[in-house]
Swiss-Prot record:
<protein>
    <recommendedName>
        <fullName>UPF0637 protein Lm4b_01081</fullName>
    </recommendedName>
</protein>
<dbReference type="InterPro" id="IPR009403">
    <property type="entry name" value="UPF0637"/>
</dbReference>
<dbReference type="Pfam" id="PF06335">
    <property type="entry name" value="DUF1054"/>
</dbReference>
<comment type="similarity">
    <text>Belongs to the UPF0637 family.</text>
</comment>
<dbReference type="InterPro" id="IPR053707">
    <property type="entry name" value="UPF0637_domain_sf"/>
</dbReference>
Length: 204
């Protein structure tokens, strides 16, 4: 498909009641956009990193009753799966779109990664002021990257078994960067460029 951007309808899809109905909306309206965006960004990251990257689209197969509050694509160096590894995400809650570098609870190197980020403070200090962090990919709550929550979030990621760390940028439904499609791709590439040094550091 030709990607024309994200619209307010995409966010409303994440408000559809019921598991089956919301999943139908996600599969029909959002996932084709994820595939189009993801293919472009996967190619971009592969070239930037000099390493083949692979696109994954969340399928929410473990859901049996409650509909997913968010949905996303992930880009990772592992073709078989992304959850154990540092990976990039583009996705939606019903009230914002996110572009993250994500370290979720399945990551087996959380202590090493957190300690590196805590020690090498410049890696995160250099991020733009309009970037954000999240301690939990299942929750909507985010914090500005430079508002004082960073150290506590990294320590929780290090010390708590289910701790997570996501860093990147969020966009409200009326943000002008979300469409047309070429503008969103350009914006996403700029965000990824800011996150690549963190990604590389996490793999060392």
């Amino acid at each position: 498909m030709t990607f024309k951007g994200f619209s307010k309808k995409d966010f409303k899809t994440m408000q559809i009641p019921g598991l089956e109905a919301r999943m139908n909306g996600i599969q029909t309206d959002i996932q084709p956009k994820f595939r189009a965006v993801g293919e472009e960004l996967t190619t971009y990251l592969s070239a930037k990193l000099g390493d083949e990257m692979f696109l994954h689209i969340a399928r929410h197969q473990r859901r049996s009753v409650n509909p997913p509050e968010s949905t996303w694509l992930a880009i990772c160096h592992d073709k078989r799966g992304y959850k154990k590894h540092p990976h990039f995400q583009v996705g939606l809650f019903d009230n914002y779109l996110f572009i993250w570098l994500a370290f979720i609870y399945e990551n087996e190197e959380s202590a090493k990664i957190a300690n590196r980020f805590l020690k090498e403070k410049k890696l995160l200090a250099d991020l733009p002021d309009n970037f954000a962090i999240s301690p939990d990919h299942t929750e909507e709550k985010t914090y500005p990257v430079h508002d004082g929550q960073l150290k506590a979030t990294l320590e929780r990621f290090r010390d708590v078994k289910k701790g997570e760390f996501l860093v990147g940028k969020i966009y409200l439904p009326d943000d002008s960067h979300l469409s047309p499609g070429k503008d969103f791709i350009k914006e996403a590439e700029m965000v990824l460029d800011e996150l690549i040094p963190l990604y590389k550091a996490s793999l060392q």
